[in-house]
Amino acid sequence: MANENIQIKSSLDDLKNFVQNPKSQNQKIKAVNQLMYNEFVKIETAINNINNYIENLTHRLELTNENFKTKVQEVESKAQQKINDRIEELDKRKKEEIENAKKYAIEKSIDSAINIVDQLEIALEFASLDPAVKNYVSGFKMVLNSFVNWLASVNIHRMDIKPGDKFDEKYMSASDKASDPDYPADHVCKVMKSGYKLYDRVVRHAMVAVSDGVGYVEPASSEQEQPQTPAKSTQTPPAQETASAPAKTKPTAPPTNNLNANKPPVVSNPPHQKPVQPPQSNTPGPKQPITHQVIKKS
């Protein structure tokens, strides 16, 4: 734009100088007409350039506006999606919390019901040892089973933990450590109190005694128990060498009876001699019968 203004000013200056020069009127008119035509052409060209520039700017502005609108819509869509996801997550979490609250509403009152089961189990354990109340054991068992079934109906289940199971702190609580040769280390050797679950949540850990492994011997594997048969030799010794080889004999000791090895030696009387009588004391005592020993002649 600045260059075009300079050109217009220069053209006007030329026109002014042309008018001031003394020339013929026709030549002046022709020159003025030509100059004006040229100026009009330049002005038209400049106007066209300006219009093209304005159109280009307008088009670029429209594209920029469209891109801006598109980006704004994308940002709004993403933001709205995040808001919807967050709302859905909160609704889902709220529903889960409400469901869990309904599901585990009786968790606080479970202890009293489990204590009743513990007391019935203790009563059965001692009733089986007392013959006076042994006849009532079957009735106690019926009451206990019906109560356990009622607990199962409200989704309170007894965990199946027995001696020999591997200790697991998720479901068990070790109250004692004992030496039991029947169980390896870190294994349950006794269950003092049963554990219970409400649905999949542990409401009471099982109270167990854990073996320390002292005195436990691992059972031999089946491969070790089978006796190994010696491999047969493919080479056979020559018959002549085995026949001609002198047999080496070892001195044999007289057989002894292992049962009499720890007994003191019995001293027998020599043949053809009377047995030696013990010395008699001077103090009088009860008369003992006289026994005669018959000695057989060999």
Curated annotation (Swiss-Prot):
<protein>
    <recommendedName>
        <fullName>Protein GrpE</fullName>
    </recommendedName>
</protein>
<comment type="subunit">
    <text>Homodimer.</text>
</comment>
<dbReference type="InterPro" id="IPR013805">
    <property type="entry name" value="GrpE_coiled_coil"/>
</dbReference>
<dbReference type="GO" id="GO:0051087">
    <property type="term" value="F:protein-folding chaperone binding"/>
</dbReference>
<dbReference type="GO" id="GO:0000774">
    <property type="term" value="F:adenyl-nucleotide exchange factor activity"/>
</dbReference>
<dbReference type="Pfam" id="PF01025">
    <property type="entry name" value="GrpE"/>
</dbReference>
<dbReference type="GO" id="GO:0051082">
    <property type="term" value="F:unfolded protein binding"/>
</dbReference>
<dbReference type="InterPro" id="IPR009012">
    <property type="entry name" value="GrpE_head"/>
</dbReference>
<dbReference type="GO" id="GO:0042803">
    <property type="term" value="F:protein homodimerization activity"/>
</dbReference>
<dbReference type="InterPro" id="IPR000740">
    <property type="entry name" value="GrpE"/>
</dbReference>
<feature type="compositionally biased region" description="Low complexity">
    <location>
        <begin position="245"/>
        <end position="265"/>
    </location>
</feature>
<comment type="function">
    <text>Participates actively in the response to hyperosmotic and heat shock by preventing the aggregation of stress-denatured proteins, in association with DnaK and GrpE. It is the nucleotide exchange factor for DnaK and may function as a thermosensor. Unfolded proteins bind initially to DnaJ; upon interaction with the DnaJ-bound protein, DnaK hydrolyzes its bound ATP, resulting in the formation of a stable complex. GrpE releases ADP from DnaK; ATP binding to DnaK triggers the release of the substrate protein, thus completing the reaction cycle.</text>
</comment>
<keyword id="KW-0346">Stress response</keyword>
<feature type="compositionally biased region" description="Polar residues">
    <location>
        <begin position="221"/>
        <end position="243"/>
    </location>
</feature>
<dbReference type="GO" id="GO:0006457">
    <property type="term" value="P:protein folding"/>
</dbReference>
<feature type="region of interest" description="Disordered">
    <location>
        <begin position="218"/>
        <end position="298"/>
    </location>
</feature>
<comment type="similarity">
    <text>Belongs to the GrpE family.</text>
</comment>
<dbReference type="GO" id="GO:0005737">
    <property type="term" value="C:cytoplasm"/>
</dbReference>
<keyword id="KW-0143">Chaperone</keyword>
<keyword id="KW-0963">Cytoplasm</keyword>
